[in-house]
Every structure is written in C-alpha cells, then in structure tokens.
Amino acid sequence: MNDSLIRIKQNFIEYILFNYRFKSRITVWVLNYLKANQDKLNNVHFVNSKINNHYTLEIAEVDATASAIQLSKDNKSYINTNQIFNYIANHTLRLDIQIHFANCHIRESRLDDLILMQLIHSPSYSSYVQDLYSISMDKRKQTFIIQTLQNNIDLSLQMNEPDYFYQLTQILNVLKSKDIQSTLHER
C-alpha cells in the first residue's frame, strides 16, 4: 500500500479522535497504536459493514446503540478491552474497522473519502467494493471521481498494468451503476 494512503489513514484517525468521543478508552488506545505503527496501519481497512471471514474491530461513539468495542471473526468475538488491545498489538492480521456513530443518519464524509481511496489503492479492493453503494457524494463530486477514474484507466493501459486497469474499471462500473440507481429513485 502506498505511503499517501497510510498518511490519509493517520489523518483520518487523528480527525476522529479529535472530533468524536468513544465509549471505550481502549478504542482511543487502539487507534493511537495503529496510527503510530505503519506496518499495522497498512493492514487496516475502514469499512461501512462487516465482511464474513474478516477480523473486524467495531468501535462505537458515545450515544451510539452499538457495543463500546468488539473484535470478531466468524463466530468468535472478543469484548474484553485488554484482550482486544493485546490481540491487535501481538498479532499480524488484516483488520477491518467499523465505526458506529451516534447519529447514524448523517454520513461522515471523511470516512466516505477514505473508503474510496482504499478501494482505489488496495490490491484487496474486491472484498470491499460493496462499500461504494453506501458512501454519499454529490453529483459534482461523483462526476469528478468518474472522470479521474477514466483518466487513470487510460493511464493504466498505457503503463501496461492490467490488474490496476481491471480494478479501476470495476470501481468505475459500480459508481456508474450507483448513479443510475439514484437517478431511478429520484423519479
């Protein structure tokens, strides 16, 4: 994963630590630990919803309806805060982080931007492409992203990068599909 995506994740973590209050102090510890450890942060993916067979750290803002903090994979869950911190600190694992906000009706635009950046730069994008359906963006931003993707698709062809071409094409198709669906709902 590239250094700019790591910096974007670090900035996002700083942003949420500064602007939100979490139910568990261990959440703050884990986020600060991940922010300071680039190798760990490289394996972190922020998500909108849990994905089967992925380790998922669920964290909750004060007044959210979800549990304060929980680490789960398949049918196994950890709720002991010290156990969660130690597990993350002492294991090398791909970790999804799902944030439960108190006001679930308002989207956090910085999270949406991060999700999009992760999709564009992550080789494991296909596991997360469904998150595109839940991010919000206005028409102007969506048009800009589509144009940028099209330019990068052209560039990937010129650079003879078929995997990146395929990745960007899939993301572009989902964005266009999302646009068509939202247009149908508006009618």
Curated annotation (Swiss-Prot):
Annotated InterPro entries: IDEAL_dom, UPF0302, UPF0302_N, UPF0302_N_sf
Domain of life: Bacteria
Family note: Belongs to the UPF0302 family.
Stated name of the protein: UPF0302 protein SERP1032
Species this chain originates from: Staphylococcus epidermidis (strain ATCC 35984 / DSM 28319 / BCRC 17069 / CCUG 31568 / BM 3577 / RP62A)
